[in-house]
Amino acid sequence: NGTLYFWDHFAAVSHVLRQYVGGYAMYNLTGGVNAISDDYRINNSFAKGTKVPSQYISVAQGFFVNTEIEADPRGVDSNINPVVGGDVLLRNNQRVFERDSPLGSSIFFKEAKAKTTATSAGGNKKVDTRSKIRLLFDSPNGYHRPLLLGVDERATNNFDVGFDAPLAEKNNEDMFWLIQNAKFIIQGVPNFDKDQEFPLGLKLSKAGLVRIKIDALENVANNVQMYIKDKSTLRFYKIN
């Protein structure tokens, strides 16, 4: 489906599956987003996924690809045609020497001590000047879901392979972009015109306080105003 999924295990080091504290960070042509966090319900470390995938993938860094659009398509009335798959091509000219973050632009999703003092090549890094809106959703049960909405002239408001990242997890509570009735974590769109509306979906396991806020803005003009529209009450809430 055009998205890379990176497992980020950011707390509670254990080989016991139910003690895992982590989630899937994602990256595609629109950009990267860090993993969902739900740690406080498992232990009291309050750890969060903070690593955002970028242009470079570290040596030995594993990732998943997927042809599914929906993690759980049962009962979903999506009008997106299935992705039938194809070839994943890794070309030699994509290779570059780049140091791991924070000294470089490469992200490795496992904590390790730096063992090198070499200097990165840095010659192939592209400066991203596209506009991006990063939202953060806090659920009643403590899930923290980051979402990305980004502008790219090659994208549309419908599903675009490589620009829209489908939800790959089945969480008890979550928030996601709705594109043609399917769920996405990253959405690429052609513009941020003032008449644009981008549907959001919520999944909750109990009643309680829900927070939706702007986590970060990238290359967005200061005079742009953003609102959350409650579809049931038709009320608007300014969030910037």
Can you say where each PLM-predicted feature lies in the sequence?
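Compositionally biased Ser/Thr/Gly- and acidic/asparagine-rich
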Residues: 1-240
